Amino acid sequence: MASPRTRFLATLSTLALITPATAVAGPDDGKHIATNTHVDSPKSFWENNDFVLKSEFGGQEPPIADTVAWVGKGYSATDNSNQYLYTLPANGTQDYIGAPGTTYYTAPHQVSGNTSPIWLGFGADTSLPTDKFRDGVAFLDLLSVDGPGEVELFTNKDDEAGTQLHRMLGSFPDSPHSAYLVAGTHTHNSTLFTKPGRYRLTYRTSARGRDGQLIANEPQTTTIQVGGQKPKEEKTPSLKERFAQSAAGNAAAAGYSLRMAPKSNPEKDGDDKLTTISFDAKNKAQGTLTLLIDGYFLTDLPVKDGHAQWDEYMGPDPSQVQAVFTPEGDAPRWISQPLDFQPGKSSHTDSSAAADTWQETSQPRQLAPTQETELKELGYTIRMRK
């Protein structure tokens, strides 16, 4: 998990002073949405003598900055088994993530009979001029990750010998930060996230010219929404805007409550690992409930007739969840107290208590430098691994 630098948004009395850049609700509504299909992102192209990173899916090639990949729940078309959860193998090859048998939200390496929830990899266009690059290769560099948890791109099998793990990119302390590319590179890999929520991944493509000079594009950032509801096709008002437009009042009298509990009556594969998040309003207010996990956006839920509900895989680790309710009409708005969530346990808070602020966390973890380093002294160790 990240070591967050947490910024507290303005109190109710000074909310109007917040700049739009701090808004956290529906932040990717209106972008190109990559989901339930085969996706190459980032895919490296060569245009105007520079690398350009795009997302290729469904006949589209938008810039990665204009794209959000949504990793929701997905199930095999063959046997209805879930395709969004990955359990660490018993052979211990991924104990750098957690103990064998621990389960995480994951965009799958392989899908069966469909591309649900998403078939996500990265690649390079066939016109990449690798003949101009030293050794005929370029590299996709993962420069930073900003989100509620860690990320890892890999392939693996639960073989007894433990020889099938291929780590590609990631944010763990010993994760690779660069993956080689040749013209036409195309990967099928798992992309694991230790918690649900909104992740911002910053990439670049780099190579060495035959003269040894660095060739690299400016860093570009893309978004992956893990869990939550699908981002909307159209752009929507931000949380800050909705909150400023909603009414102040006596939230305690309105009778708002937020509850998290293990999902009852599991129906689909993986449901036994889900948590049901429920919001209720005794005043039957309608509006939008924004959920944040460790200060990062998780999802927006429509509140109808005083109720909203969502089943989510919260991951194996504790987290802190906060809700912000922006009702329609003259019903009072509410910011919940941060709710400490423990996997497999029930948690509850209500509007008899309210927070003056909601938390917004942003702590990009810098993984790789963008500046060249000149080695001026001895004593360095180089590690190479297959």
Residue locations for each model-derived region?
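Secretory targeting and sorting signals
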Residues: M1-G26
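Phosphate/adenylate-binding glycine loop and adjacent helical scaffold
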Residues: G26-H177, V182-T185, A216-P219, Q225-R385
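Short, hydrophobic/aromatic alpha-helical segments in well-folded domains
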Residues: H188-N189
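Surface-exposed loops/turns
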Residues: K195-P196
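Extracellular/periplasmic metallocenter environments
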Residues: Y199-R200
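Hydrophobic/tyrosine-rich beta-strand signature of extracellular beta-sandwich/beta-rich modules
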Residues: Y203-T205, A323
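Short, solvent-exposed loop/turn segments at the edges of extracellular beta-sandwich modules
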Residues: R208-Q213
